[in-house]
């Protein structure tokens, strides 16, 4: 097997279930998938699941680690269900583009952007 393509996934933590499915589908295609950490529901104990980094005082560290994942990737795939792209995800897109990484989107959000390439699975 030749070197597998490395894909970094970006998207809101509100899409955690869909992100996990997308990771699995891309892995089945033989890709190495880098993404953010998905935590089990029991971890949160009443905390807001979408902003856990802020609550634990580690948002800056987690954001920097994700940028290093983008550095390691061959391409970036954005899970933008319903066209949603939050502030952190937009920052990751901007970073990837500034560093010459191809950026693809699961759903078209702008006619000037590339939509997910045909080799990647549909996610609903």
What residue ranges belong to the model's regions?
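Conserved catalytic or regulatory cores that recognize and/or transform ribose-phosphate-containing ligands
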Residues: 1-124
């Amino acid at each position: 097997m030749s070197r597998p393509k490395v894909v970094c996934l970006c998207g809101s933590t509100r899409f955690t279930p869909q992100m996990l499915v997308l990771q699995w589908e891309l892995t089945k295609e033989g890709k190495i998938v880098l993404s953010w950490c998905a935590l089990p529901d029991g971890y949160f104990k009443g905390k807001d699941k979408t902003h856990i980094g802020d609550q634990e005082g580690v948002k800056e560290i987690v954001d920097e680690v994700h940028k290093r994942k983008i550095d390691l990737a061959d391409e970036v795939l954005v899970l933008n269900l319903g066209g949603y792209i939050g502030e952190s995800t937009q920052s990751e897109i901007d970073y990837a583009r500034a560093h010459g990484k191809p950026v693809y989107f699961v759903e078209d959000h702008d006619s000037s952007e590339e939509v997910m390439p045909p080799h990647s699975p549909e996610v609903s």
